[in-house]
């Protein structure tokens, strides 16, 4: 069986009602934060974890490179993860920052003069490399993720 903190394994809170969508009594005590942390509240909040995952799943569905593309690690900095996913049709750059502060990093070995189109980013503007450059400097938000399509 599973061991650890049983308080972390409480029934899913579908609504702010302790019984959720059921008339039955839950088999375990519900979470203490049920009034604010439930599926109904998450559906209303565009910044919720629900919408974050929905966005990522939609990206994966619409960009096959995320699921079947070749994986190429890019060496950047400590507490960051950077890699490309590529198919014959598409190349994506994925950047993750595990730092609690924003972090500037240099991404190298990109196609000469490439343009990075934001698919998931805090900046909606494309980033362009110099016409003769294969490198770009990007500042990642604290504990953030950015996904770009490389053109």
Predicted regions and their residues:
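Loop/helix patches that line or flank the sugar-binding groove of alpha-linked glycan CAZymes
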Residues: 1-104
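Active-site donor-binding loop signature of nucleotide-sugar glycosyltransferases
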Residues: 14-17, 121, 150
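Residue-level preference for short coil/turn positions at secondary-structure junctions
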Residues: 89, 112, 141-142
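Short, surface-exposed beta-strand/loop "edge" segments at domain boundaries and coil↔beta transitions
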Residues: 90-91, 124-127, 146
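Conserved active-site loop/cleft motifs that coordinate metal ions or position small ligands
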Residues: 93-96, 118-119, 148-149
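Beta-strand-rich binding/interaction modules
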Residues: 102-122
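Solvent-exposed beta-strand/loop surfaces of large extracellular or lumenal domains
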Residues: 117-135
């Amino acid at each position: 069986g599973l061991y650890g903190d049983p308080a972390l394994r409480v029934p899913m809170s579908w609504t702010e009602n302790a019984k959720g969508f059921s008339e039955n009594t839950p088999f375990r005590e519900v979470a203490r934060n049920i009034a604010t942390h439930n599926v109904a509240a998450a559906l209303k909040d565009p910044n919720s974890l629900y919408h974050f995952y929905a966005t990522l799943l939609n990206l994966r569905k619409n960009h096959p490179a995320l699921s079947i593309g070749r994986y190429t690690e890019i060496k950047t900095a400590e507490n960051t993860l950077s890699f490309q996913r590529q198919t014959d049709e598409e190349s994506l750059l994925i950047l993750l920052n595990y730092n609690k502060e924003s972090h500037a990093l240099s991404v190298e070995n990109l196609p000469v003069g490439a343009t990075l189109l934001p698919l998931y980013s805090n900046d909606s503007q494309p980033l362009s490399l110099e016409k003769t450059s294969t490198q770009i400097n990007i500042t990642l938000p604290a504990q953030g993720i950015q996904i770009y399509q490389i053109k």
